Amino acid sequence: MASGLVRLLQQGPRCLLAPVAPKLVPPVRGVKRGFRAAFRFQKELERQRLLRCPPPPVRRSEKPNWDYHAEIQAFGHRLQENFSLDLLKTAFVNSCYIKSEEAKRQQLGIEKEAVLLNLKSNQELSEQGTSFSQTCLTQFLEDEYPDLPTEGIKNLVEFLTGEDVVCHVARNLAVEQLTLSEEFPVPPTVLQQTFFAVIGALLQSSGPERTALFIRDFLITQMTGKELFEMWKIINPMGLLVEELKKRNISAPESRLTRQSGGTTALPLYFVGLYCDKKLIAEGPGETVLVAEEEAARVALRKLYGFTENRRPWNYSKPKETLRAEKSITAS
């Protein structure tokens, strides 16, 4: 104790009067900033959980602010088509929905007379829409590609009326949200049937001309960017080419290797040309000579059918006045 006082006196009076330096304390994080960080972390955890286990899809009718009658009316206005509301409502009612609702009523113990729903299935409208769509598409394709054979026209029509194309169009037109079905998401077969029922309702409401334009605008457009043999699957292109040339009184094609590169590498490339009467009619690439020959045959078929990559695009500006829509409706 005494030695400490002696040292303070030796340092002088200024040391006694000097203020004590404050102790440095690490800054404490604010409550607000900590809450924000925790909230962001919680949101990230929730996002990762939804990515791992996404929730099951929910019908739009099970969410708030849903008016089915208003949605039906808005559907026609959105497409700029005049539908009969009764026909349009019928087009969205599937037989599986009627059966499921009647079964639910029976389980609740409701009387048999009250179990039956006053709803009509869209089966008849769907059959009319399917028949008219196939006939109308056949006429469109025959007028646009007169050199395409009947088998090719048939395959293109099957592609445009298939489940993949029709369901893609129906989902983008919000047909799935209005469809009354037992299951959700709506199965592809049910959605396809509903879309053709909508076409059948439009056919009875606005006539064949407006329905033909509807088919042109929403189904023919699905051919954009598609190659012919993506829609028409053929197994033996060379055999088909020989038949087509024979119909035109042209000699059978002769294949020749025109170019090649990297034959000893892992990625070889061969070009095979097809000659008729010493004239090059087509040339195609491939990783083998056989594949290149088949591709050359496909190129030649595209030229014969007028379905080349640089073909004239489909004219959507003016509908044809001589459309055989009356014949379509009578045939359907």
Swiss-Prot record:
- Location of the DRBM domain: 236-306
Give the main EC class. hydrolase
| Record EC number | 3.1.26.-
The organelle transit peptide extends over 1-30
Its main localization is mitochondrion
Which keywords has UniProt assigned to this entry?
Answer: Endonuclease, Hydrolase, Mitochondrion, Nuclease, Ribonucleoprotein, Ribosomal protein, RNA-binding, Transit peptide
For this protein, the record's InterPro entries field holds:
dsRBD_dom, Ribosomal_mL44_DSRM_metazoa, RM44_endonuclase, RNase_III_sf
GO MF entries: double-stranded RNA binding; ribonuclease III activity
**UniProt domain RNase III: residue ranges:** 86-228
Tell me where in or outside the cell this protein is found. Answer: Mitochondrion
Q: Name one GO cellular component term.
A: mitochondrial large ribosomal subunit
- Quaternary structure and interacting proteins, as annotated: Component of the mitochondrial ribosome large subunit (39S) which comprises a 16S rRNA and about 50 distinct proteins.
Q: Record's family?
A: Belongs to the ribonuclease III family. Mitochondrion-specific ribosomal protein mL44 subfamily.
Q: What does this protein do?
A: Component of the 39S subunit of mitochondrial ribosome. May have a function in the assembly/stability of nascent mitochondrial polypeptides exiting the ribosome.
Protein name (record):
Large ribosomal subunit protein mL44
- Which organism is this protein's natural source? Pongo abelii
Starting at the broadest rank, the lineage of the source organism is: Eukaryota, Metazoa, Chordata, Craniata, Vertebrata
Question: What gene name is given for the protein in this entry?
Answer: MRPL44
